[in-house]
């Protein structure tokens, strides 16, 4: 009993600490020049094989990798080649050009993606400053981060691992919330897609911190993720977006997240905003993940963990510890302490409903407040439009949310949601997450 009380006290303390995390301010003055103009002529060593990876020991050598990949020229694409960081790197002297890029133009665009393996070797990159807003002379990249665009090559080997990026600053988009051009941004990766078909790739043991601002798909670690497994990664990032914004990932398709954490606050002026993910879509699984930041949005579909989940999405043993605030006053906010909205997609399989959303042993510890007091507002789930949802062993704090039911609107069946006091919710978190 004493051990359980000690663990319960620790969980409550962690929630308080997470809510009080300092906000990392972005750089007031941008560095001068682009790192690709200062690229080295060679790496520090290695031949690019798994046994003998190219060695990167300086900022100039890292810039060489970016310049090579972005050139798209022959062997410089480094497809299926290996890289290893040999020392900590400071990028504060110049603006970083994302490693791998894509551009958009009327009638077509261009893309040069990173298609290799990068081992951070336990080292740290500091001083990252990326500004791909279209108002800049160089701002033509749709996806921004240390890596702009990655095309995964379908190997079970981690394509990025053992890397820390500390206090990075990333901008994407044109700074105009009404723009029709969409961008993706994360401190580590702007966008990642499979190179061939639906082959999965792995990203593991990566930690990032800083600030991210993007017109769309703004997130702490990765803006847009497709067919990727993330393992034991953490994002402590203040995120500002217009739509599809999340503390860890903005938009995701057919991906898996295990043991991942989002610590930063998320603010969005648009729709689909969550403490961990803006959108979880199509065959996506989340296990033992947490969102500790507060979430605030100006449009619908907002949740402490995810704004929106649709089509074969499972979230298990995961928590949302931050508060949720919707500023939408003239429309249904679809706001939930854990998930904003669960939605059914299309059709069935041989007469059986084949699309589902599952929440298993998930908990919401924050307070939900909305500018519009009626509508789809729930302690755990804002709106259920899924037609085929399973909720088992979940809870929300009914002390902080005394007027709310577990589901705000359109209940489709029996929900395993318990309204509990603060200590009981923390106990559930202790049992199911830690």
Segment roles from a protein language model:
Residues 28-434:
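Surface-exposed repetitive/solenoidal architectures
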Residues 1-11:
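Bacterial N-terminal signal peptides that target proteins for export
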Residues 11, 15-17:
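Residues within alpha-helical transmembrane segments of multi-pass membrane proteins, especially transporters
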Residues 17-26:
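C-terminal segment of classical bacterial N-terminal signal peptides
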């Amino acid at each position: 009993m004493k051990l359980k009380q000690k663990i319960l006290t620790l969980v409550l303390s962690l929630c308080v600490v997470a809510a009080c995390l300092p906000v990392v301010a972005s750089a007031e003055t941008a560095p001068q020049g682009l790192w690709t103009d200062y690229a080295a002529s060679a790496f520090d060593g290695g031949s690019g094989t798994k046994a003998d990876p190219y060695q990167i020991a300086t900022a100039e050598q890292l810039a060489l990798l970016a310049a090579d990949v972005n050139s798209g020229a022959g062997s410089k694409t480094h497809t299926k080649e290996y890289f290893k960081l040999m020392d900590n790197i400071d990028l504060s002297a110049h603006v970083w050009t994302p490693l791998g890029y894509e551009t958009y133009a009327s009638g077509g665009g261009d893309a040069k993606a990173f298609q290799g393996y990068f081992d951070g070797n336990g080292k740290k990159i500091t001083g990252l400053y990326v500004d791909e807003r279209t108002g800049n002379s160089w701002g033509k990249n749709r996806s921004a981060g240390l890596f702009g665009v990655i095309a995964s090559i379908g190997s079970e080997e981690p394509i990025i691992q053992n890397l820390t990026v500390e206090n990075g600053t990333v901008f994407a988009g044109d700074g105009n919330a009404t723009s029709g051009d969409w961008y993706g941004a994360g401190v580590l990766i702007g966008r990642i897609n499979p190179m061939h078909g639906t082959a999965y790739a792995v990203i593991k043991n990566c930690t990032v911190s800083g600030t991210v601002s993007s017109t769309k798909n703004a997130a702490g670690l990765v803006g847009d993720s497709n067919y990727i497994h993330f393992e034991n990664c953490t994002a402590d990032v203040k995120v500002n977006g217009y739509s599809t914004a999340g503390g860890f990932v903005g938009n995701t398709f057919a991906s898996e997240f295990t043991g991942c954490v989002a610590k930063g606050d998320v603010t969005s002026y648009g729709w689909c905003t969550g403490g961990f993910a803006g959108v979880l879509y199509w065959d996506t699984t989340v296990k033992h993940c947490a969102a500790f930041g507060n979430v605030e949005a100006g449009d619908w579909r907002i949740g402490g963990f995810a704004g929106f989940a649709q089509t074969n999405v499972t979230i298990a043993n995961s928590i949302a510890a931050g508060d949720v605030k919707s500023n939408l006053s003239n429309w249904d906010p679809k706001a939930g302490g854990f998930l904003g909205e669960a939605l059914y997609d299309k059709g069935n399989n041989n007469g059986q409903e084949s699309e589902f959303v599952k929440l298993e042993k998930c908990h919401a510890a924050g307070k939900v407040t909305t500018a519009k007091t009626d509508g789809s507002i729930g302690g755990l789930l804002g709106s259920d439009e899924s037609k085929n949802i399973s909720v088992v062993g979940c809870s929300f704090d009914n002390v902080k949310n005394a007027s709310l039911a577990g589901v705000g609107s359109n209940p489709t069946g029996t929900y395993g949601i318990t309204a509990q006091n603060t200590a009981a919710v923390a106990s559930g978190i202790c049992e199911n997450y830690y």
